[in-house]
């Protein structure tokens, strides 16, 4: 039986089923004991990789073996033997440890917290029948506390005799190991429990194979005993099912837990290290080991193929790798009492992953480096910062000695030691590489609040330190301490006890400081000595003992007046303010020395120059008074020539070189007070030689090996490019080791002798010309690497506009890219030169969190930058997208971390952003964040102290630091970027727009004057944690010195997402993989979210014919929404329901505001009913806006769809519709002959059809669009339906044939000719209570092919078309032939009908182009922000409808609007002379014309103020006053205040020259703000100058608030001056009305006015 089972497994593993959807579905089965574990794994993995759907089913071993042809991998409780692994090319991986527990049900002990204890021998006797009673003496002796309670009752045993690869077989083997007698009896019984005495005596029962079954049996069986997985008992047990504790093989008492199971695994690690993955770990010999431990194994083929596509194999392998490397996987397993592998075993398992091959190529391409070593803070940041797409590094803290031992067994890819390498290890490992990476100091550290802030630090000497540790000095005010320190510190030293903190655990740092102090003080050597584990004899109230090797730093900062030796980097990482400080030391010669970069560097350089041994130095003692006396080398250890995998060795080499050469890596170490080894020439040379000799199979493995020569890179005379030297012009040779010799002189002599002088001159000229050409060609070649021909770019839709240009989506060489095209008006000679300089700068910037520069066109007028396309758009849009219903806190923090990482890189590269905001943080398809728009900025050193002019001002006021707003001198723009990042973190926390409702000027004034910041509420703190909020507050702090660097921000955010924090004891791992886990209690913010809509119309498509859904869009949004949206979407054969408001066009024309409100009410009823019934709202079409009157709804069950129609039709009668709308016949209330209300409000028709569909998914929101023939037929059925009527197809009624169908009436048959002459029998649903509705059949227009119906009089159109605004079915232009007929309103324009011309301006909306529509010249104002949510779109519809009705000779005619993305815009009449600003600037009009234009302007403003409702312009200025060819003026840019505000963050905002003071103060305002603006316009027209010229944004704002106004010319007429001053009065109530202004200007015009 066993051999048959193994054979079946082998057949499956070698065949490897390729079923399921490509790259989307992995099916597995395995033991029941692993169900809980895999449920957790699968849930967590969905947040790491949403591209793959993993299914796991727990089954019996025989079921597993019988269905191996349909599974992708299996999980076993036992290992497959090595013979079978080799024979059938199987690879298996130890997955997780579990504890089996003997579990009992004793009613007498139910109320007791005591657990019975059993030993191995006694347990064996119970199971072979020598002990049969619960009160047996052996059991009582083991449990004296409750022995008297044990009953004289039979022990009832529950078991399973399944043996193959089950824990029952493992239990038999364990019991045989426990008891020789049991082993003998088991063999007599043919290896079955069934044949042993307990069963023969009626006390043994075969109760089932699985642990869960045995647990259920035990719950019902008093006095029962069986073996169960501890995870099952822990998660599903009751008070009556209690697991036993045990005495293990070594005789020690143990409990089932993480420690005891991992100890058992560790006992067998030597077998795993030798690649033996077939062992069982029961009855382990260790002191802490659980006797009944076992390991789950995952098995799969090691040789897949031949296969056309290895994607599924790759996905499976990535999942296995994730199990071993993700912290969330380990943590969730531990919570359920499954125990992750020992870290060294994880490393072995990961290495085995590289043995999985597909088509003879290793499947796993990413290299996972595992390192162990001393707890060093830099090792929490270096791996995270280095990790690339191809490599991942993880670092775990362990003593240096353990790091060395793991190298011996290949248990780690690299190690870190801080105590050197003893010579004995070189004997064991001749190829051991020892590479110093950095050095650090170990310091006497103190936390004395009383002396914080004083000049200098506390001074101590070695004898004082000794006496502190011996308890001789126990007060900080001791006279000997005072004698060493100055007056200021002496005055503040407190009279309090010294609290000594030390580690009562073996520690590298213990050894270094005790050995050092023993050499400095004989007294210390005698009393304490050199030891890894010091023992102090201080009073308990004078010391704090910690057993955590990382916790000294935490204890120091948590306990005032404390003292300890600790690494310097450990105290710098504790807090922003120097609460814990390093004491200075007075040396034996009386000199005072402090720990700093200089004294550390001198200590290391002195040690190296004197030939100090790098390999075996436990620490470094400074030998002069300029060197810090105690420092240590942080040294990387690795196997120099025997690493098994070349790719892994290469990754180790690259990581090592990166730490020594990369500016980010060096900066990370330097900031933490470390000295990087590459700063020392000897160490740098030594390390390079080590990399040169780093080999696998004798071949150099480092990516720079071929460039290393005598400890240099290319002899320091060139650069290493693709592992070969590119020499400087005057050097040559493989390593640039030779100087280029000059033979020109001798050649010249020969030529002078041989050739006439004239020929020589000609040759020289030719050489010079050739040299010049070559130089030009070389320079051009460098530029050609990134220069692109503008005409190679295939431009697509606009993605948005910024301060310096517009961004387009484009295709370039078959790749989607983003192209930023510079505004032509900005391109001067200086701008062109600066642009090229910045491009050169950008070509060198490469970072995973910075948008990738790809190419550029530098030739005017088509200057542009080509960048990678970020498919998910900006963070600004994502946060405002209402369809992304939830973003988990951990993902928000990770987004912030990635953004900080990108900014840290820019700052490290000497680049400041100066326009950092959520709009400039972009997301790719995997939700990776990248910083954009940093180009075209200045290098920071050239920018400090410089101000931006108002022409350069981009409206990013919300994110701008107060010092930048106030134009202070010597601005640190690095810290200004940090301020902006604080606002972004607030946006991530709240998903709100900062300072919504305030004008830019009001924001700027409040930020500077009132220190205003966006509001943080209690719910924000609850959602994101107080630590996150604290980081926000210090980022946007007014005091720039308090703001952190981006490196500090990264560290804090890394801690919040489960990153390291080694020195403060928060974690021992530096994994770059966050734990993307969303707990069950996600807090949902209920605040209004502005700007919510789909981010893109980019869909992947998959056709589904089953209940299994999987996206092919490959986006990380699956991580979030696939788990947050628990509702299962309808798939397979579904019911499509269309709902549609008929006559919507008429109702919008009748009263736009009322129709807007009615549409909101209608949408709410449909969605509330849908949620109650359980359907799904589909996108109707990609370019169609939601919520316009039509819904496409999808149901899995027909009865649910019919119930929805009935309930919603009734609910629509209960709504309190707007009275103004009920005046229209298409919405009027109607009653039947009995007085029952049967109609009220807009009439809603509904059509239903059933069938299969095509489903496409949006990559951002994960919302699905349903399409196909079934949807089209449902839409056509809806088109023939009257308002208030519900019609369905026969395919729907067939699905409810078993229900009462008395309320369903047949209407006959129709033929739909555009779907292969599809004939449809249709039926009407008669809704109870609405029977009085009479329709007389269906509503046809010219429908044909209608048969077998007396009610169907007309014919049906023979084609299905889509109109641009409504959804048209057929060619007859009648309103109700459309779904969403709201799109047919006369003021809604099809963008394709407009011929777009040249750009003529940039306004508050965005870009303005000239155009032609129906042979009429028009102005097209296209919004920068194209993502408008449903609520805003309805408001926009209502406002455009209202504004299009306005008619006045002095306001611009609103022709209409285009409502479809990506071309949302408004269309107005075109004014030939442009703006008033342009006219007065270029023509200098005469006085009478000036007064005439002002008079007409006032008339236009007055009309707006007298409209109902009143229209306040808020932005009156000459650029918004347009002039026609006859010099008549019209007011433009009125209305759409909300959309203007949303768009303003993407466009230039200029200065508030025309803004009334009440707006700047953020107060409520009236139409008098327009009067104020008009007063400024009067001055501007008067003088033909720009107000407040030369003043920046903040000066203008403050001047207006302080009452400053433009200077009035002395020759200005008195009446004009008086009116102007009245208009711009500071107090609104003192300003005239526009009627008064009109009268005043009318008087100035006199009788000659010509209007």
UniProtKB/Swiss-Prot annotation:
Top-level taxon of the source organism: Viruses
GO biological process, one term: cyclic nucleotide biosynthetic process
Molecular functions (GO terms): ATP binding; protein serine kinase activity; protein serine/threonine kinase activity
Compositional bias ranges of the Low complexity kind: 1100-1115
Occurrences of domain Guanylate cyclase (ranges): 1135-1278
Compartment(s) where it occurs, according to its Swiss-Prot or TrEMBL record: Membrane
Annotated region (Disordered), positions in chain: 1089-1115
Gene3D superfamilies assigned to the protein according to its UniProt record, in alphabetical order: Nucleotide cyclase, Periplasmic binding protein-like II, Phosphorylase Kinase, domain 1, Transferase(Phosphotransferase) domain 1
Spans traversing the lipid bilayer: 749-769
Glycosylation sites: 111, 135, 190, 236, 275-276, 287, 452, 455, 477, 495, 540, 596, 722
The enzyme's E.C. designation: 2.7.11.1
Keywords: ATP-binding, Glycoprotein, Kinase, Membrane, Nucleotide-binding, Receptor, Repeat, Serine/threonine-protein kinase, Signal, Transferase, Transmembrane, Transmembrane helix
Binding site for ATP: 799-807, 820, 1400-1408, 1421
Active site per database record: 915, 1515
Annotated InterPro entries: A/G_cyclase, Kinase-like_dom_sf, Nucleotide_cyclase, Prot_kinase_dom, Protein_kinase_ATP_BS, Ser-Thr/Tyr_kinase_cat_dom, Ser/Thr_kinase_AS, Ser/Thr_Kinases-Pseudokinases
Catalytic activity: L-seryl-[protein] + ATP = O-phospho-L-seryl-[protein] + ADP + H(+); L-threonyl-[protein] + ATP = O-phospho-L-threonyl-[protein] + ADP + H(+)
Enzyme class: transferase
Signal peptide: 1-19
Domain Protein kinase: 793-1057, 1394-1645
Membrane topology: Single-pass type I membrane protein
CC annotations in GO: membrane
Name of this protein: Putative serine/threonine-protein kinase/receptor R818
């Amino acid at each position: 039986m066993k051999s048959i089972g193994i054979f079946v497994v082998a057949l499956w593993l070698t065949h490897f089923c390729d079923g399921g959807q490509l790259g989307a579905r992995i099916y597995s089965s395995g033991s029941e004991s692993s169900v809980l574990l895999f449920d957790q794994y699968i849930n967590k993995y969905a947040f790491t990789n949403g591209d793959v759907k993993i299914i796991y089913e727990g089954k019996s071993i025989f079921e597993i073996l019988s269905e191996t042809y349909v599974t992708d991998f299996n999980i076993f409780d036992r290992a497959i033997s090595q013979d079978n692994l080799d024979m059938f090319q199987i690879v298996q991986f130890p997955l997780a440890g579990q504890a089996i527990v003997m579990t009992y049900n004793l009613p007498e002990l139910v109320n007791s917290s005591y657990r019975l204890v059993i030993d191995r021998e006694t347990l064996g006797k119970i199971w072979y029948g020598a002990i049969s009673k619960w009160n047996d003496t052996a059991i009582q002796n083991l449990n004296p506390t409750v022995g008297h309670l044990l009953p004289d009752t039979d022990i009832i045993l529950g078991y399973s005799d399944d043996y193959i690869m089950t824990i029952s077989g493992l239990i038999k083997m364990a019991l045989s190991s426990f008891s020789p007698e049991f082993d003998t009896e088991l063999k007599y019984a043919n290896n079955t429990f069934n044949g042993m005495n307990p069963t023969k005596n009626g006390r043994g029962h075969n109760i089932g194979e699985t642990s869960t079954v045995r647990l259920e049996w035990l719950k019902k069986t008093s006095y029962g005993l069986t073996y169960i997985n501890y995870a099952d008992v822990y998660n599903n047990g009751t008070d009556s099912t209690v697991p036993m504790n045990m005495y293990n093989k070594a005789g020690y008492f143990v409990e089932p837990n993480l420690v005891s199971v991992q100890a058992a695994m560790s006992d067998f690690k030597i077998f795993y290290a030798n690649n033996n993955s077939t062992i069982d770990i029961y009855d382990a010999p260790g002191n802490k080991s659980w006797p009944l431990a076992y390991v789950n194994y995952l098995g799969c083929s090691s040789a897949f193929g031949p296969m056309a596509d290895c994607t599924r194999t790759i996905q499976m392998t990535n999942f296995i790798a994730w199990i071993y490397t993700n912290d969330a996987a380990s943590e969730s397993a531990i919570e359920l009492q499954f125990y992750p592998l020992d870290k060294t075993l994880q490393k072995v398992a990961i290495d085995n992953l590289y043995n999985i091959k597909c088509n003879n190529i290793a499947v796993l391409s990413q290299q996972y480096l595992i390192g162990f070593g001393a707890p060093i803070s830099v090792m929490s940041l270096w791996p995270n910062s280095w990790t690339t797409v191809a490599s991942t590094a993880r670092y775990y803290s362990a003593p240096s000695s353990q790091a060395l031992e793991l190298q011996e067994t290949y248990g780690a890819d690299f190690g870190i030691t801080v105590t050197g390498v003893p010579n004995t290890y070189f004997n064991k490992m001749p190829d051991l590489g020892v590479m110093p990476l950095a050095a650090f100091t170990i310091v006497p550290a103190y936390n004395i609040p009383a002396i914080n802030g004083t000049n200098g630090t506390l001074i101590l000497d070695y004898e004082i330190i000794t006496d502190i540790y011996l308890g001789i000095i126990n007060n900080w005010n001791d006279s000997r301490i005072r004698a060493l320190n100055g007056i200021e510190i002496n005055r503040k030293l407190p009279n309090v006890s010294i609290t000594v903190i030390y580690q009562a655990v073996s520690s590298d740092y213990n050894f270094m400081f005790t050995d050092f102090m023993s050499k400095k003080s004989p007294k210390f050597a005698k009393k304490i000595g050199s030891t890894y584990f010091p023992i102090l004899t201080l009073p308990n109230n004078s010391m704090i003992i910690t057993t955590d090797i990382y916790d000294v730093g935490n204890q120091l900062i948590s306990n005032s007046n404390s003292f300890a030796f600790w690494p310097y980097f450990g105290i710098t990482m504790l807090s922003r303010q120097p609460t814990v400080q390093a004491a200075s030391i007075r040396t034996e010669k009386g000199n005072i020395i402090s720990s700093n970069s200089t004294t550390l560097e001198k200590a290391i350089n002195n040690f190296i120059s004197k030939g100090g041994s790098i390999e075996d130095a436990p620490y470094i003692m400074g030998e002069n008074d300029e060197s810090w006396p105690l420092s240590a080398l942080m040294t990387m250890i690795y196997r120099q020539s025997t690493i098994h995998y070349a790719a892994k060795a290469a990754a180790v080499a690259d990581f090592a070189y990166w730490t020594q050469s990369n500016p980010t890596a060096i900066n990370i170490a330097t900031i933490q007070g470390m000295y990087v080894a590459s700063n020392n020439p000897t160490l740098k040379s030594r390390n390079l030689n080590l990399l040169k000799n780093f080999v696998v199979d004798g071949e150099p493995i480092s990516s720079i090996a071929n460039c290393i020569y005598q400890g240099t890179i290319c002899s320091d005379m060139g650069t290493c490019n693709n592992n070969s030297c590119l020499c400087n012009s005057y050097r040559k040779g493989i390593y640039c080791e030779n100087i280029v010799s000059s033979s020109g002189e001798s050649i010249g002599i020969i030529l002078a002798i041989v050739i006439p002088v004239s020929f020589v001159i000609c040759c020289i000229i030719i050489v010079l010309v050739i040299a010049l050409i070559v130089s030009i060609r070389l320079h051009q070649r460098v530029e050609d690497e990134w220069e692109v021909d503008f005409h190679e770019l295939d431009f697509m839709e606009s993605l948005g506009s910024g301060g310096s240009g517009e961004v387009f989506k484009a295709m370039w060489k078959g790749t989607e890219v983003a192209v930023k095209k510079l505004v032509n008006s900005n391109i001067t000679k200086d701008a062109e030169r600066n642009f090229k300089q910045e491009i050169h700068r950008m070509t060198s910037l490469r970072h995973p969190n910075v948008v990738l520069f790809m190419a550029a066109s530098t030739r005017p007028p088509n200057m542009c930058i080509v960048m990678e396309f970020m498919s998910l758009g900006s963070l600004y849009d994502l946060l405002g997208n209402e369809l992304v219903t939830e973003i988990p806190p951990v993902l928000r923090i990770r987004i912030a971390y990635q953004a900080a990482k990108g900014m840290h890189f820019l700052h490290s590269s000497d680049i400041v952003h100066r326009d950092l905001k959520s709009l400039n943080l972009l997301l790719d398809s995997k939700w990776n964040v990248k910083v954009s728009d940093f180009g075209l900025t200045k290098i920071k050193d050239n920018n400090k102290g410089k101000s931006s002019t108002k022409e350069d001002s981009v409206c990013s006021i919300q994110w701008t630091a107060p010092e930048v707003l106030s134009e202070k001198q010597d601005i640190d723009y690095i810290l200004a970027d940090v301020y902006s990042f604080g606002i972004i973190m607030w946006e991530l926390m709240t998903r709100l727009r900062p300072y919504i409702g305030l004008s830019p000027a009001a924001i700027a004034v409040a930020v500077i004057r009132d220190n205003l910041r966006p509001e943080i509420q209690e719910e924000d703190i609850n959602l994101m944690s107080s630590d996150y909020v604290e980081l926000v507050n210090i980022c946007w702090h007014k005091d720039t010195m308090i703001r952190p660097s981006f490196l500090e921000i990264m560290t804090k955010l890394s801690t919040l997402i489960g990153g390291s924090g080694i020195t403060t004891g928060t974690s021992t791992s530096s994994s770059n993989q966050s734990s993307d886990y969303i707990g069950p209690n996600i807090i949902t913010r209920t605040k209004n979210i502005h700007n919510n809509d789909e981010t893109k119309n980019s869909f992947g498509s998959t056709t589904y014919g089953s209940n299994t859904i999987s996206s092919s869009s490959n986006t990380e949004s699956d991580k979030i929404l696939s788990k947050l949206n628990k509702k299962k979407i309808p798939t397979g054969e579904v019911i499509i329901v269309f709902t549609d408001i008929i006559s919507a066009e008429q109702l919008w024309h009748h009263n736009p505001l009322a129709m807007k409100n009615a549409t909101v009410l209608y949408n709410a009823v449909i969605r509330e009913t849908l949620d109650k019934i359980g359907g799904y709202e589909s996108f109707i079409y990609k370019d169609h806006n939601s919520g316009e009157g039509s819904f496409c709804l999808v149901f899995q069950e027909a009865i649910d769809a019919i119930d929805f129609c009935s309930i919603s039709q009734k609910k629509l009668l209960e709504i309190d519709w707007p009275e103004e709308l009920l005046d229209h016949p298409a919405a009027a209330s109607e009653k039947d002959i009995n007085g029952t209300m049967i109609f009220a409000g807009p009439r809603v028709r509904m059509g239903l059809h059933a069938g299969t569909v095509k489903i496409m998914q949006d990559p951002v929101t994960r919302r699905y669009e349903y399409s196909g023939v079934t949807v089209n037929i449902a839409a056509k059925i809806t088109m023939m339906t009257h308002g208030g009527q519900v019609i369905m197809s026969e395919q729907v009624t067939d699905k409810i044939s078993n229900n009462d169908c008395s309320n369903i009436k047949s209407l006959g048959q129709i033929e739909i000719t555009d779907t292969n002459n599809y004939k449809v029998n249709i039926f009407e649903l008669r809704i109870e209570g609405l029977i009085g509705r009479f329709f007389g059949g269906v509503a046809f227009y010219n429908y044909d092919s209608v048969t077998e119906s007396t009610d169907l009089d007309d014919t049906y159109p023979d084609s299905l078309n889509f109109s641009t605004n409504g959804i048209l079915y057929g060619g007859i232009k009648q309103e109700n032939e459309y779904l969403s007929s709201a799109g047919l309103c006369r003021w809604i324009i099809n963008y394709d009908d407009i011929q777009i011309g040249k750009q003529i301006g940039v306004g508050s909306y965005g870009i303005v182009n000239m155009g032609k529509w129906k042979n009429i010249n028009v102005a097209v104002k296209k919004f920068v922000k194209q993502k408008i949510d449903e609520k805003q779109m309805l408001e926009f519809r209502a406002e455009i409808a209202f504004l299009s009705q306005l008619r006045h000779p002095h306001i611009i005619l609103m022709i209409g609007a285009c409502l479809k993305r990506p071309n949302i815009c408004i269309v107005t009449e075109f004014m030939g002379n442009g703006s008033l600003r342009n006219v007065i600037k270029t023509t200098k009009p005469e006085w009478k014309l000036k007064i005439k234009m002002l008079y007409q302007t006032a008339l236009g403003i007055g009309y707006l103020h007298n409209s109902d409702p009143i229209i306040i312009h808020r932005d009156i200025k000459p650029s918004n006053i347009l002039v026609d060819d006859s010099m008549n003026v019209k007011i433009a840019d009125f209305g759409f205040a909300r959309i203007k505000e949303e768009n303003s963050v993407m466009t230039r905002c200029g200065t508030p020259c025309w803004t009334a003071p009440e707006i700047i103060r953020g107060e409520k305002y009236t139409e008098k703000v327009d009067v104020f603006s008009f007063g400024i316009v009067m001055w501007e027209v008067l003088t033909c100058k720009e107000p407040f010229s030369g003043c920046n944004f903040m000066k203008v704002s403050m001047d207006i608030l302080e009452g400053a106004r433009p200077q009035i010319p002395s020759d200005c007429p008195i009446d004009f001056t008086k009116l102007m001053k009245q208009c711009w009065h500071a107090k609104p109530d003192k300003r005239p009305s526009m009627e008064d202004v009109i009268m005043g200007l009318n008087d100035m015009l006199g009788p000659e006015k010509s209007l």
